[in-house]
Amino acid sequence: MTGEKIRSLHKDQKPSKDEDLLEPDEEATAGGTFTRTGKLKSSKMFSNHKVIRSPSNPALLQNHHHQQISPITPGESKSDVYFPVHECVLKGDIRRLSSLIRSHSIGQKDSHGNTPLHLAVMLGNKECAHLLLAHNAPVKVKNAQGWSPLAEAISYGDRQMITALLRKLKQQSRESVEEKRPRLLKALKELGDFYLELHWDFQSWVPLLSRILPSDACKIYKQGINIRLDTTLIDFTDMKCQRGDLSFIFNGDAAPSESFVVLDNEQKVYQRIHHEESEMETEEEVDILMSSDIYSATLSTKSITFTRAQTGWLFREDKTERVGNFLADFYLVNGLILESRKRREHLTEEDILRNKAIMESLSKGGNLMEQNFEPVRRQSLTPPPPNTITWEEYISAENGKAPHLGRELVCKENKKTFKATIAMSQDFPLGIESLLNVLEVIAPFKHFNKLREFVQMKLPPGFPVKLDIPVFPTITATVTFQEFRYGEFEDAIFTIPDDYKEDPSRFPDL
């Protein structure tokens, strides 16, 4: 069970100019983690059926009128906006907070991008935090520095609070999936039946990784409200990949608990994707979060531009080539910046050395079981010194320079310009919106979710038949749509074969 899995649920809306298109390992170490048994557990393949990706959309949550997230708009001064819920949280006024919750937004961001839940967690104010969680305050939303309330809770180090936030995150995930299901089924029903084949080629600028990165040919069958995905890439993180012969089946007619099935075609077994976790699994995940770096990565698209790629040495002309069966115009993608931040103020020197040893072992193909890497039950940390910042000092601070609340930061930041090429075809039969609906079903595969997020950007005309996307901070993927055809298929390919046996533990990370 890993912290990484709590990031991978898809968004229900198009990203803004500075949306988080890349969120690898936000609350865990980058390369996968480890369990009590010493067995390596990479991030969950099907994590988005566990955790909400963007509870900032008010329609996804129960208390709709409380969940609007509305930071200050450009040109609007802080003196023009009042944040009474934030103020009483910072002051620890639980009685006033319980009154304000009935009539005010508890998902609103202040001028520093913090929600009331952010402040409660940073200050270690359990009463306020639990009251906000009881009213379904969004847990996934990020502040101006890119940190979620869960990330801040890990920094503060109160185990009970981390556990409460993690459970609420999973609950909001289930609500999100249930909310989206009718819309998704309607969109699938309106699509024609088709076969789609696409190829993945992964690359890295890290020499050790470039030798072990996989490629994959994925086959997608869509009929009615059923989808089947055949893949050879069972699990993939930036430090490890697992190959096999896997089929993922979504049956839109089945009950939600029966909709998603994974087939292991080599062992002839299947496993249903479950939604609930045991108490032990949750506690183990908290141990891992508390012993790992807190990580956030954002692909900033504020200054993105597309320019036609050129070909020819003497006489330059716009590059147009065939990709698979489709004629495509090639563009250079400029202005993409990958901003990553890593925090470790909650870790001991022993934790840091241990995590480094794990990464080195994995990069060399080592076996964690042999080296006895086992997470230890983590106790709550000693709280940081009490807050001395007044409300006036906090709210009047310059944007981007908010007084720090909570444990003193130990943060490393890095920026990298991401260079990419994209090929757009006017001939491709499928539209981007239709592709997004299909990808939303198979978004449990993390790399497919990255593809879905990337194509939500405002792209040049046509369909992206070939594109480069960032999958992890050190890894990019070239995705090529090789083949597309409309057609009908045998119903049998969307059902579990009779000779397959159920194995609930076949995919322990599921």
UniProtKB/Swiss-Prot annotation:
GO terms for cellular component: cytoplasm; endoplasmic reticulum membrane. GO terms for molecular function: signaling receptor binding. Signal peptide: none annotated. ANK repeats lie at residues 80-111, 112-141, 145-174. InterPro entries: ANKRD13, ANKRD13_C, Ankyrin_rpt, Ankyrin_rpt-contain_sf. One of its GO terms (biological process) is protein retention in ER lumen. Acts as a molecular chaperone for G protein-coupled receptors, regulating their biogenesis and exit from the ER. This is Ankyrin repeat domain-containing protein 13C-A. The lineage of its organism: Eukaryota, Metazoa, Chordata, Craniata, Vertebrata.
